Amino acid sequence: MSGSYPFIDIAALDSVREGFARGDAQLVLAHDLSTVLWVNGPGAKLFGYNRVEDLIEGQLDLPVATRRQIAAFSSENTSAPSAVAVRLGGGLRSELTHLHVSNIKLPDGVAALLVATQMPDNSAEAAISGLGDDSTHIALVDAVGKVVAASPRFALLDISASTLEDLIVEAGDATDRIVKRRIRTGSHSVPGAIARLTDTPALHLLCIVGDAPAQFQTAAEAVPLPDNAEAVLEEILPEQGDAPAQQAQKTHAEQPRPKTFAFDHDAPPARFIWKVGPDGTFSEISPDLAAVVGPNSADIVGRRFSDVANVFGFYTDGSIAALLLERDTWSGKRLLWPVEGTRLRVPVELAALPVYSRDREFLGFRGFGIVRPAEAEADPEEIGLALAGGIPQNRKPRKEPAETARMVGEDDVLALSEEVANDDQPAAVLPKPPLDITPTPGRRDSDKVISLLNSCAQEKVAADQAKFLKEKERATRPEGGLTKTERNAFREIAERLRKQGLANTRAESETPVSETSSIEPVEPTPPVKTRSEPIQPDETALLANLPVPVIIHSGDAIHYVNQALLDITGYESLDDIRSAGGVDVLFNSESDDGETRQSMVLRHADGSEEPVDAHLNAIAWRGGRALMLSLMPVTAADLPAPAELPAANDEEKQALEAHVEELKTILDTATDGVVLIDPEGRIRSMNHSASALFGYERDEAEGKFFSMLFAIESQRAAMDYLHGLSGNGVLSVLNDGREVIGREAKGGFIPLFMTIGKLPHTRGFCAVLRDITQWKRTEEELTNARKEAERASNQKTEFLARISHEIRTPLNAIIGFSELMADEKFGPIGNDRYRDYLRDINRSGNHVLALVNDLLDISKIEAGALDMQFEAVSLNDAIGEAIALMQPQANRERVIIRSSFQSNLPDIVADSRSIKQVALNLLSNAVRFTAPGGQVIVSTSYELNGDVVMRVRDTGIGMSKSEVEQALKPFRQINALEGRKAESAKDWRNEGTGLGLPLTKAMVEANRAQFAIDSNPGQGTVVEIVFPPTRVLAD
């Protein structure tokens, strides 16, 4: 099971484990609501997937409505689950599903969303459905170690009951409810983990990673005997009348043998993974090594590397032990590993890198190795036999000429079979079998003769002939076949090989046939192919006479080159090629102009190059394995015709070069950093500004990944931005840039704004990075200033609230006593002047109280602390109540109030108390500043664009633009131009608090409406309040 987080780590989270045990469908999403971080089997089934692996780390395409519902919850900072009803599926099969969405924290602290729902099937089998494969095994275990449910191949692990009980005890003692360690399965140990899901009743989730031991037994039997093996053995072994020792040996061979490990010499190279701790002790090794060298030979977990090296005999100079102490990355270390049950050892190449914790604590090494069974060689100490439990023989079996010939023949057949396996189709002509067991009349069965049909050279001729026929058959295919030049060359090679083979056949026909004098006893271990015979001189002679250049090499080591290769390259000998650099100096994968060719490029001794076609085969070479590379020069007819280019214009070339230099200078002059990126996400180059911005030299950053320029928290965002532009999605069209955090070479951080664009010809990208440190500083200063202003406003509001409370108490007493004295309830005052003084005291007290109330209201509005209850308000009714309250005052001032309300006016969404206060303030100002005989007109209307408008027009004295601006400021009164008042009118300008219009405007804006005033001196004033369509409850 893949994924960024181990499956069991998320399954053991407190918010996940109980639902997992119940069999709920669970899904963990990233906050983009597309990336699936984790899912269980029922969750995968809920969204139409059969396997968990099909959905983890994938993209989930949720419906737009579903995403909107989940996104609305994700913005809430709460961990409590929220019920969301969504429709899953599509078309006619869409079903309403109730999901529970909650915010969770992943093991590394990253925030994510858990989406869960109950499923009708809550069985244990349903809880682990969709989990487990050939290498991953899942089981649910109860409190006593009983397996409640398991994946299909879990039983093959053969885990004992005592092991399960120990795991349950360890999981109960673990603070994080998880135990991870190697678990014994049969005769092997594999990595695994167990998590305690529930306590009452106790239920545990067990995860095992690794193949079942039965598969190793199957691999040990994977090399079957030929069909005629029994007949051959009966023909070779002695009869009943032979020596007693031979008879006893036959009886032993007839007994059934236990299944043991069998070494497969022809197996391909295998790759395995290994880990060691800080002290050099092996903590983990993958089963791939055991499949090649045997389970006993690979059973090194828990042993120190130095001890294993001493026992297995590959501890030579101590270089690997020294590298383990240096705690640095290393590779290319080669050692010889003994093979269980054989006298062989196989080469193993090791590489490793150090592992550190988040606290930079050294945890050991993690590495990989490559074991090459085809390059096995004889082990003089025969350690492999001791690993299998056998005792090495004191005497070595004597090889007869026929046995030696048989081994050589097998090598040739192996080389031919590998060449056939590398082709796409079977060969048309198959070679004859190399061995022929022919009974001879008149002889005893013990004297049967095993004769060779061909020598080593004849087998090579047959192999090359079969290969030539196969290549001839493939030449008819439309793609990948040989060219006409290659077919002619191979016909010439085949003719020469045929003639050489006939000459060798005639020479060998005169050689007497060797016979075997005795048959060696059958070893208890499986037979192993030996490759100790050197190659025949005839084979080298054949290669030397070939007109085709041939190279025989193993990796970077060249073993042989023929004269044709020396002639074409211009080197004098093989030693000259080795001293010049070996294989690397002969070939160039790219041409001078940087364009990669389909064919290889052969480099001559003088530095010139020539395109060639190459054919690679695996062959047997001097007791080992090697690669034969045959080359064929590409003729002019095979090369594509170059396009005819116009004659180069030196002036245009110079102008183009000058233009390129100008562009480079412009990029270096730009203050923004510019970075060029290749399609693989590596840095190609950067300008001077980018180099100075990050503190890297140009050559130091080239070739490294683009993500190195960013802080850890911004690396994923930057790479997602880059990958999004690589496709043809929305990002490639709507490219609005990203804010990221850059990382300097010395470890500092820089806020950046990054914009990336695609380069048309190279398929790369261009990133423009701008330092926004000053912007961020200004933004921070503005934020701090806003917080300071809000704090000052809150202090002002708190101050006014306290002052209001302190002033109200004495004011209420003054107003109340003045009214009581003016009413003369306790006796006459006796003087009218005292009565006037009492009325002045009462009026002044009410004026101060109104001023305090207005101050408190406007401060609350500015601080956003005014309690407003928005509801449906009938604007006509609210204005009508205000007119009714102002009508007595208008009558005393001899001012006519007229109203014009539109019928069927829709209600508005507003605060009813503040709307009435606004209407009262506007009517009060209009009546107070209108001379007797004037008019005040109040109207409402419903505009075509959906606005509801309220207008208050008067015929008063009016104001100029400067006076309007002054009137809209708090505590400002208009005290100029007093001569405009009528003779019988009193001084309206000296009354009021200067808060009428500012408070009215603040209340209007608090109700999400617009306030406008238009006034002209001597013509009156019009105040207009507009409620937008969003605040209108239209039918």
From Swiss-Prot:
Catalytic activity, as annotated: ATP + protein L-histidine = ADP + protein N-phospho-L-histidine
Region annotation Important for polar localization: where it falls in the sequence: 1-613
GO molecular-function terms, A-Z: ATP binding; histidine phosphotransfer kinase activity; phosphorelay sensor kinase activity
Record key words, sorted: ATP-binding, Cell cycle, Cell division, Cytoplasm, Kinase, Nucleotide-binding, Phosphoprotein, Transferase
E.C. number(s) listed in UniProt: 2.7.13.3
Spans annotated as Interaction with DivK: 614-1035
InterPro entries, sorted: HATPase_C_sf (IPR036890), His_kinase_dom (IPR005467), HisK_dim/P_dom (IPR003661), HisK_dim/P_sf (IPR036097), PAS (IPR000014), PAS-like_dom_sf (IPR035965), PAS_fold (IPR013767), PdhS_histid_kinase (IPR048231)
Domain Histidine kinase: 802-1031
Pfam families in the cross-refs: HATPase_c (PF02518), HisKA (PF00512), PAS (PF00989), PAS_8 (PF13188)
Span of domain PAS: 659-730
CDD domains, alphabetized: HisKA, PAS
Subcellular localization: Cytoplasm
GO cellular component: cytoplasm; plasma membrane
Top-level taxon of the source organism: Bacteria
Phosphohistidine modified-residue sites: 805
Stretches for region Disordered: 500-533
GO biological process: cell division; regulation of DNA-templated transcription
Subunit structure: Interacts with DivK.
Function statement: Functions as a polar differentiation marker. Essential protein that, by localizing in the old pole of dividing cells, controls cell division and maturation, probably through control of DivK phosphorylation status and cellular distribution, which in turn regulates CtrA, a transcriptional regulator of the minB operon. The asymmetrical localization of this protein is probably required for cells to enter a new division cycle.
Protein name, entry field: Cell-division control histidine kinase PdhS
Organism: Brucella suis biovar 1 (strain 1330)
